[in-house]
Design a protein with these regions (language model features):
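Short S/T/G/P-rich N-terminal loop/turn motif that feeds into the first structured element of a domain
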Residues: 1-50, 54-68, 76-91
């Protein structure tokens, strides 16, 4: 069963998001195994990120690599919302 993860950090700018993605790419862990989609949206310092994952195990493995990078960059991800996906419709 796929999972939808929704991050709504207290503050996240495009520059912070781009720096985190750059670091994840440098570490060779992004895009991660099991990550179907990542969507970043919003404006100013109120960006949000939604992801669709194949499994909780893959999400947890990625989270273990992500958390130290976010801490190093001073990004507080907040507490994500995690829900099971009922259906994904693609074009």
């Amino acid at each position: 069963m796929s999972l939808l993860i929704r991050f709504a950090p207290p503050s996240l700018t495009a520059e912070q998001y781009d720096n985190a993605v750059r670091r994840l790419n440098e570490e060779g862990v992004f895009p991660a195994d099991g990550l179907d989609y990542e969507i970043c949206f919003g404006s100013g310092d109120k960006l949000k990120v939604s992801q669709v994952w194949d499994s909780k195990e893959q999400l947890d493995a990625f989270g273990a690599r992500l958390r130290p990078i976010l801490a190093e960059l001073g990004i507080d991800p907040g507490e994500p919302e995690v829900v099971e996906v009922h259906s994904i419709i693609r074009r």
